[in-house]
């Protein structure tokens, strides 16, 4: 610590030595000033400086009521207090003469080094450095945080007695406002001894203060180095504030170690996240391509890329969000993004920015609105159901029923490009297949059926899906004629370009006039299930005729009948030689 050995002039010492001590002069100057406030220098009255309450506390602390009085209190020099108030006090001794203060010092300016030492020293050391000698009474005034700091930050406790209230901590009235503002800051260090006289000029500790301020960056914390008065100095109150940040350095270092182990958020995440991100990505998320592909406009720099086909699933919750009402989709936008929590609800007095799902009581729902069925693909009216779409398909001429790919190629042989027909798929995993002519070759592809919709692609969000096969084929014919939308088949041979799919000329099974026998069979097959045909009241040859596979085309029937006749004749020929 830095102390200044500044004493009084020799003339005042000789005048005091020449006088005989009176009864009140036997007391130490601090007790004498406490008993007689008029003995203070002009302009330093307690009531005028801190008010009547603080003045009374100062007098009680000066009389030693805050701690046990006795000779145990030591001065800075190591001796006992010369005050005659304790039992058997030693006679007062005049202080040794010291050099006068330099003209360039400012008594109201306190260096950062003293503030650091004051913040780091213990209360026991502060008890040893405080004394009731006459040198402390003549010390210069410190910052306004001295009295308030000792009254608020160092309360008397059971372990350590409170520090006697020093009267030399009084400041001129010009420093009152700043001292009152910094009452919560740590107390400044004990002042160097010297006479109480106003001095002006720059401090010789300015260079050390500047070095410390650069080291601890106290200028940026206090908002600048000017201190608000336009000069380059800071008042003692501001220095006390910087000392408070320095004394907290140890605790903040420990807190930084703890916080360093926790996951920190970046500035962008902390600005846009209202709640904690500790359970990140706990559930499945929906790809942004799948969500926004239908919302891209023509002005998008990139064309809409079709998302990959999903895994096959029979769950009813796969694509149920596409048919829910708008209020259900708009309100919990995060419901499809299950990893992010929902934002907090708005206050009750503020209008909602988006419609929310309000819980409806059972009694209110019965009287307010009729029950509405969930509009999912499996619950539709009978006109658009799967069975109705199949009944509608049977009336179309380009549907040939059960037919393999060889027979389809025979039907399309010699037809122009764009000719097509629809038949039952030979693969049990699929329902229908499409056979068409393109580039002089007959191609075959399976038609996808996903949740009651038909298309050539299995993706559920494919925009050209239809509820019935007839509707899909009609739209495909329309797109093929105007050329706005084309289908392409990926080639199984690597390196070959995809094959365009154009449906222009349907090959109808009604192109040839059928026999009455064939039409009757066709009608029976429409009305009777194939497993109920043997129960019909008909002769066995007629039942076998009705149960034949190719009941849509009589020519195929004739062809098969000829093959059967040949096989029967061969079997007969083999049986005859053996007999």
Swiss-Prot record:
Substrate-recognition component of the ECS(SOCS7) complex, composed of SOCS7, CUL5, ELOB, ELOC and RNF7/RBX2. Interacts, via the third proline-rich region, with the second SH3 domain of the adapter protein NCK1. Also interacts with GRB2, INSR, PLCG1, SORBS3/vinexin, and phosphorylated STAT3 and STAT5. Interacts with SEPT6. Interacts with phosphorylated IRS4 and PIK3R1. It is a peripheral membrane protein. GO terms for biological process: cerebral cortex radially oriented cell migration; fat cell differentiation; insulin receptor signaling pathway; intracellular signal transduction; layer formation in cerebral cortex; negative regulation of signal transduction; proteasome-mediated ubiquitin-dependent protein catabolic process; protein ubiquitination. Residues 1-25, 89-270, 295-315 are annotated as: Disordered. Disulfide bonds: none annotated. Residues 124-492 are annotated as: Mediates interaction with SORBS3. Disruption phenotype: Mice are smaller and half of them develop fatal hydrocephalus between 3 to 15 weeks of age. They display subtle alterations in glucose homeostasis with an enhanced response to insulin which causes hypoglycemia. Pancreatic islets become progressively larger. Conditional deletion in neuronal progenitors leads to impaired cortical lamination due to increased levels of Dab1. Widely expressed with higher expression in brain and testis where it is expressed by spermatocytes and early spermatids. Also significantly expressed in spleen, skeletal muscle and kidney. Keywords: Cell membrane, Cytoplasm, Growth regulation, Membrane, Nucleus, SH2 domain, Signal transduction inhibitor, Ubl conjugation pathway. Residues 89-99, 155-165, 185-196, 301-311 have a biased composition (Pro residues). Residues 502-552 form the SOCS box domain. This is Suppressor of cytokine signaling 7. GO terms for cellular component: Cul5-RING ubiquitin ligase complex; cytoplasm; nucleus; plasma membrane.
């Amino acid at each position: 610590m830095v102390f200044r050995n500044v004493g009084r002039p020799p003339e005042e010492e000789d005048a005091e030595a020449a006088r005989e001590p009176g009864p009140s002069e036997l007391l130490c100057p601090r007790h004498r000033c406490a008993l007689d406030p008029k003995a203070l220098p002009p302009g330093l009255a307690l009531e005028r400086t801190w008010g009547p309450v603080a003045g009374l506390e100062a007098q009680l602390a000066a009389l030693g009521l805050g701690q046990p009085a006795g000779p145990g209190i030591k001065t800075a020099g190591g001796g006992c207090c010369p005050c005659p108030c304790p039992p058997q006090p030693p006679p007062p001794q005049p202080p040794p003469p010291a050099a006068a203060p330099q003209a360039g010092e400012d008594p109201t300016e306190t260096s950062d080094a003293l503030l650091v030492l004051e913040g780091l020293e213990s209360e026991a050391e502060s008890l040893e450095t405080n004394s009731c000698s006459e040198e402390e009474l003549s010390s210069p005034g410190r910052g306004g945080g001295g009295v308030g700091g000792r009254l608020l930050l160092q309360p008397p406790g059971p372990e350590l007695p409170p520090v006697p209230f020093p009267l030399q901590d009084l400041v001129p009235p010009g420093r009152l406002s700043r001292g009152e503002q910094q009452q919560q800051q740590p107390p400044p260090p004990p002042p160097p001894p010297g006479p109480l006289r106003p001095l002006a000029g720059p401090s010789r500790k300015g260079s050390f203060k500047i070095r410390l301020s650069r080291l601890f960056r106290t200028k940026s914390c206090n908002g600048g180095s000017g201190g608000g008065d336009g000069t380059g100095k800071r008042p003692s109150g501001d220095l006390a504030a910087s000392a408070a940040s320095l004394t907290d350095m140890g605790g903040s270092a420990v807190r930084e170690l703890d916080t360093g182990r926790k996951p920190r958020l970046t500035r962008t995440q902390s600005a846009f996240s209202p709640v904690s991100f500790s359970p990140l990505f706990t559930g499945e998320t929906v790809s942004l391509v799948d969500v926004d592909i239908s919302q891209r406009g023509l002005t998008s720099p990139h064309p809409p890329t079709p998302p990959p086909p999903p895994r096959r699933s029979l769950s009813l919750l796969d694509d149920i969000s596409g048919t829910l009402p708008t209020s259900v989709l708009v309100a919990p936008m995060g419901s499809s993004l299950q990893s992010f929590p929902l934002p907090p609800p708005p206050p009750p007095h503020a209008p909602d920015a988006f419609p929310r799902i309000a819980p409806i009581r059972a009694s209110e729902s019965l009287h307010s609105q009729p029950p509405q069925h969930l509009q999912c693909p499996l619950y539709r009216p009978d006109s658009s159901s799967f069975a109705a779409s199949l009944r509608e398909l049977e009336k179309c001429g380009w549907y040939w029923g059960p037919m393999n790919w060889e027979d389809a190629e025979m039907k399309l042989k010699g037809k122009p490009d764009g000719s097509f027909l629809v038949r039952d798929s030979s693969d049990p995993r699929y329902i229908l297949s499409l056979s068409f002519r393109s580039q002089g070759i007959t191609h075959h592809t399976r038609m996808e059926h996903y949740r009651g919709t038909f298309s050539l692609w299995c993706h559920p969000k494919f925009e050209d899906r239809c509820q019935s096969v007839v509707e899909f084929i009609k739209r495909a014919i329309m797109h093929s004629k105007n050329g706005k939308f084309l289908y392409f088949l990926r080639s199984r041979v690597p390196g070959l370009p995809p094959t365009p799919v154009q449906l222009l000329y349907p090959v109808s099974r009604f192109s040839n006039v059928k026999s009455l026998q064939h039409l009757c069979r066709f009608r029976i097959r429409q009305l009777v299930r194939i497993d109920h045909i043997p129960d019909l009241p008909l002769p066995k040859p007629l039942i076998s005729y009705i149960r034949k596979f190719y009941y849509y085309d009589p020519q195929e029937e004739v062809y098969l009948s000829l093959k059967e006749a040949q096989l029967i004749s061969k079997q007969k020929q083999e049986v005859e030689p053996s007999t």
